[in-house]
Amino acid sequence: MTRDTATPATIEHRIGPTGRLSVKVADWDLVLASSPDDVARVRGADGQALPDDLEVERGTDSLSIRQPSRFPGVGFVLGAQAGGRRLAIEVPAHAAINVESASGDIAANGLRGDQHLRTASGDLRLDAAAGDVTTETVSGDISVGVEGSVGLAVKTVSGDVSVEGGRVERVRLATTSGDVRLTSELGPGPHAIMTVSGDAILLSNRGLRITAVTVAGDLKSDLPHTSEGGPGRRSLVVGDGATELQFRSVSGDLRVMDPAAAGNGRIPTALRPVASQQSPLNEPDDAEATRLVILRALESGEIDIVEATDRLATLDGARDA
């Protein structure tokens, strides 16, 4: 492996059709596209010069580019803005990529290998995506346009998520307060959507079985369906129920809609909040105090969404007993 400290106008390295590319910068936008050959290329977009502090490592089938002075660790630098600076990146379509920008936007088009994309305050947009895709952002929105089939893992705090087109073989989607719109065909799974207060819209005319664990949220379908269960734990079956999806939320709703709604503009961007059947103001003081402890632990990261919903469901069950 060789390491460069001087930054040329364009960084090029042959990594092969299934090689590896890693790019970590602080506040540049990243624009990725498939290359016509097996060479990875990185340059400043629109004639911009590359950052002068890049550290470049070339391996037999890999290229790594990093801003060590601006990107000291895995944590993100919040509050900075990209200011219109962009890196244009070409990479073989089936290469494995790992790209991170602390505050810049990331866009990718036509990539089909293992993809890991991460930003803190920027947006993520993938077009004509296939392969295994992992995306993560804190406050930015995530948009995934699928071409062919994809395995998808999505994590965001306050950003909204949109997935459309193609076929999603499996999905694990977690958000705190962002809303979710999933209109792609679903494969065999497993499929899971987890939110705290975010709502989810799912388009499907195929058989679905949705199992929901929620505290104050609701589960709805515009299609003919059957449902069972009560507050806290419910299931909803559309058609033959062949495809299973797990939904966990504290107060978010999930709604199944007919794909015909996609063609006439009737898909809402968010669901109208549904009032809980029992207001927390009417709960005993000790139950409300316990509820606040659970929610604060979730907010601080001490527990995850799954554990929080289980604890809250247990709390409500004890209250109703």
Regions found by a protein language model. Give the residues of each.
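Intrinsically disordered, low-complexity terminal regions
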Residues: 1-321
